Amino acid sequence: MTKKKSTEKEDINPTIKAVSQTPKEKEDNLKEQLIQAQQSAKDNWDKLLRSQAEMENLKRRNAKDVENAHKFALDSFVKALLEVKDSLSMGIKTAQEEKATVKHIVEGLEMTNKVFLSTLEKFGVVMINPEDEAFNPELHEAVTMIPMPGKDSNSVLEVVQFGFTLNGRLVRPAMVVVAQ
């Protein structure tokens, strides 16, 4: 009960103060409140303007980052392909020498092909080589069908052109000859 009585007294005191103020004091009090409200509004307005400027800067920075990402997205891919180009150039130079043999040229081409395929795999490109597998119309395109006794129907007999996927998505289907 003591707490309740003291709370009632506190509630009455502000009312008494407000009633006991002179008009001049009321005016001064209201002016002070107005000044504080105006200052608070000004501070909030400044915060809003800074936030808007920060958002504009963020938009510009993000737009520039996206532009750079588009420009240089293939940078590492191109650098990796240059390795393959260098290998081809060395192969051509070697093939032009008088002592070059067909065997050496073929070995060089096979090595270059391996480098090329490993470069593609680094970037998520996987070769589809479906020889002796069942024909899959989602990954393979039948060039022709040949009756072949002793082979399962709809199995791939020969790969005419390899297919490729990029990160699991088909880029080019494998062109195949299928057993009928």
UniProtKB/Swiss-Prot annotation:
Residues 1-12 have a biased composition (Basic and acidic residues). PROSITE patterns: GRPE (PS01071). GO terms for molecular function: adenyl-nucleotide exchange factor activity; protein homodimerization activity; protein-folding chaperone binding; unfolded protein binding. Residues 1-31 are annotated as: Disordered. It is found in: Cytoplasm. GO terms for cellular component: cytosol. The keyword Transcription regulation does not apply. The keyword Nucleotidyltransferase does not apply. Its main location: cytoplasm. Gene3D superfamilies: 3.90.20.20, Head domain of nucleotide exchange factor GrpE. Keywords: Chaperone, Cytoplasm, Stress response. Transmembrane segments: none annotated. It comes from the Bacteria. GO terms for biological process: protein folding. Pfam families: GrpE. Participates actively in the response to hyperosmotic and heat shock by preventing the aggregation of stress-denatured proteins, in association with DnaK and GrpE. It is the nucleotide exchange factor for DnaK and may function as a thermosensor. Unfolded proteins bind initially to DnaJ; upon interaction with the DnaJ-bound protein, DnaK hydrolyzes its bound ATP, resulting in the formation of a stable complex. GrpE releases ADP from DnaK; ATP binding to DnaK triggers the release of the substrate protein, thus completing the reaction cycle. Belongs to the GrpE family. This is Protein GrpE. It comes from Ruthia magnifica subsp. Calyptogena magnifica.
